[in-house]
Amino acid sequence: MNFADTNWLEAMFVHIDEERQRRVVVERFHRRHPGMIGLSHIVLLETRNIFSRITGSANPDEWQELQAGFSGRFYLDPMNWDLLRRESFRLFEKYSHQAAIGTFDTVVLASAILAGAERMLSFDENLKALAVAEGLEVFPELSKEGLAFLAKLKRRA
């Protein structure tokens, strides 16, 4: 299953000039890879906040459009908080001493792993590097920055 990060959803739904290049990447991906996109409640919480912040609207149309996708476009993993905490702690133990991993990135990845994700859809290089370190595919591919972060994650202490 493909699993989307907040910045992927932002590129899908928010029509601002700064996101145009990302939007083209997202649209091309979905034409080539149709099917459901996995989301977690963690991503959904951040997306709700970001959509209002970017649009300046208390209840943005983009949020309504995303919610309409729960009738077949998106799969919202029910998420078990105890399992999420356990998986996040596992990732912290494995990588926090290797590189400065973000707490939120780690929790997003933990939720993707628990949801059965095979591919992470994101524009965040650190999150994608962490996903690759855990055996997930990523799209778009890692940049030089992401590959450098991945090398830090793979160092042996």
Predicted regions and their residues:
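Acidic catalytic patch
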Residues: 71-97, 106
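Hydrophobic/aromatic ligand-binding patch that stacks against planar heteroaromatic rings
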Residues: 29, 111, 130
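Short beta-strand scaffold positions
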Residues: 4, 38-39, 79, 103, ...
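Acidic, metal-associated active-site segment
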Residues: 6, 102-119, 126
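Acidic, PIN/NYN-like endoribonuclease modules and their adjacent C-terminal/linker elements
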Residues: 1, 76, 115-157
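Short, well-structured N-terminal submotif of metal-dependent ribonuclease cores
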Residues: 1-42, 54-65, 134, 149-150, ...
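Alpha-helix N-cap/helix-start capping motif
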Residues: 7, 41, 82, 124-125
